[in-house]
Amino acid sequence: MRSLVTEEVGDAKVAGNPLIEVEHLSRVIGSRLQKTVILDDVTFSIPAQSLFAINGPSGSGKSTVLNMLTGIDRPSSGRILFAGQELRRMSENALARWRGQHVGIVFQFFQLVPTLTALENVLLALELGGGGKLRRRDWRERAMDCLEIAMVKDRAHRLPGALSGGEQQRVAIARALANNPPIIIADEPTGNLDSRTAYQVFDTMAGLTRQGKTVIYVTHDKDMAARASARIDLLDGHVVDQHMANAIVVEPQPVMEVHS
């Protein structure tokens, strides 16, 4: 399987060191007269090169945490540090640039452009993200490498409608890898898949940590959450449990490096 070599991101890039630190995070919506607390004083850290799960039932606040980790939403109080850099202090433009350079997002419902092939969907991500510091003439090779990592290279020229749900999610993973971000964030990546396909997609994501990626995923599935190397359990906007340093259950695969 091919590998995209992740660039260094300060001292926190060393495996096991905190890459992301969430401190006393709260999110409150509504007016002064009628407030709704979505998150209340949430604190946790995400180790570099970990497979990190945010687990909880519907309404627990896990999607809100995800949106704040990607910079889509701002916290009411508290802060998020990425390799020591505080996201809340960034302007909207700076935050958008940061997100484009550092985060690849995998959506629950794939969000592939239906009129573009799998390869073209990945190439579009390169176009929108600036090409991951590659020359344009190298984009196609990078896109094919990403599809190979996600194990759908043989589906490169098919439209999403001709792919199974699991294959579409793998293309979405390839797209998230296109600009070689150090962080992959996935929103219920196995939620719409049958159990066998879900575990196959999970193993693909877990394998990315061996290539230097930090993979963060939201799930309501306790079995999927338990397979992570670290996780938090949310309930009603609070962290009710934290689990660190579990073993990731995934079969080892040979890696062939591709340097940009």
Positions of PLM-derived features:
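Pre-NBD coupling/linker segments of ABC/ABC-like ATPases
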Residues: 1-14
